[in-house]
Amino acid sequence: MQQAVGMYVEAPTPDEAARLINSGRKLGIVIAVGVCEVFYTGRAAASLGPTRRLVILKRDGTLLVHEAEKAQPKIWNPPGSSTAAYVEGGKLVVKSIRSRPFETVRVIFDKVDFIAAFDVGATELTLVGSERDVVGALVKNPSIIEEGLEVVGVEVPTDVGHLDILARDKNGRYVIIEVKRDLATHEAVFQLARYVELYRRKGYDVRGILVAGDITASAYDYLKRYGLNFVKINPRELMVLTNKNPLNAK
C-alpha cells in the first residue's frame, strides 16, 4: 500500500521485502517485524536464536535489532555502516558491514510479518546537561562515583586520547574514569581499557571505572573481562543536584 509519507507491506515475500528495504532506506527509516536469527562477528562473536524481533534500518547506515524488553538494541551497527538486503536460500537476509573496526551483522528472516519505509526527518538535539556538564558535576561531587575519591585531573592528555577524570581513591590508588552521558557501548570499554593499560605500562597502580547512564550487555561482558568497574548514573538527577538543569529551576 502506497502512502504520501512512505509505504508498507504485510506478510511480504522475501523478494518484496528485500526490494522495499533497499529502496526504502533512502526515505529515512525502514522497520521490519518477523521471526529471525541474528549473527554478529567482529571483535567477538554473538548470535541470537529464532524469535520475532523488530529490526530498524536508518538512512545513515544504523542497524538496530530490538526485542520485547529494554531500551537498548540486542545487537546493532552504528551510523556509517553499509547495509544491503537480498534473498538467499529462499529467506530474506539483511547484512550490515562496519569497516572500521570490521564488524558484520546478519539478520536472517524465517518469516517477515510486516515491513514499512517512512519519510522520517532528522533534527539536532539540544541537550540540557551535556557530557561535559556531567563530567563537571562528577568532578564537584566525586563521592557519587565512589566514597573517598579525590580528583587530581580532568581531560588529562595521553598518547591514546584525553581521559575524562583522573582520581585517587581512599587508599591512594589511581582511578581512571571514563564518562558517557547515556548508553555506554563496547567502544567506551575499549577506550577505558587503553587508558588503564597505558598507565600500568608506566608503572602506576591503577584501576578503571566506566560511569554512564546505562551499558549494553556486550559492553558489560567486556568490562568484566578487563577487570573494570561500572557505575550507573542518572544524568537528569545529577544536573538537578548541581543546579545545572534550568527545566527544574523553581
Swiss-Prot record:
GO cellular component: cytoplasm
Enzyme Commission number: 3.1.-.-
CDD domains with a match to the protein in the record: NucS-like
Compartment(s) where it occurs, according to its Swiss-Prot or TrEMBL record: Cytoplasm
Keywords: Cytoplasm, DNA-binding, Endonuclease, Hydrolase, Nuclease
Listed Pfam families: NucS_C, NucS_N
Residue runs in coiled coils: none
GO MF: DNA binding; single-stranded DNA endodeoxyribonuclease activity
Enzyme class: hydrolase
Highest taxon above the source species: Archaea
Family statement: Belongs to the NucS endonuclease family.
Role played: Cleaves both 3' and 5' ssDNA extremities of branched DNA structures.
Record's protein name: Endonuclease NucS
Gene: nucS
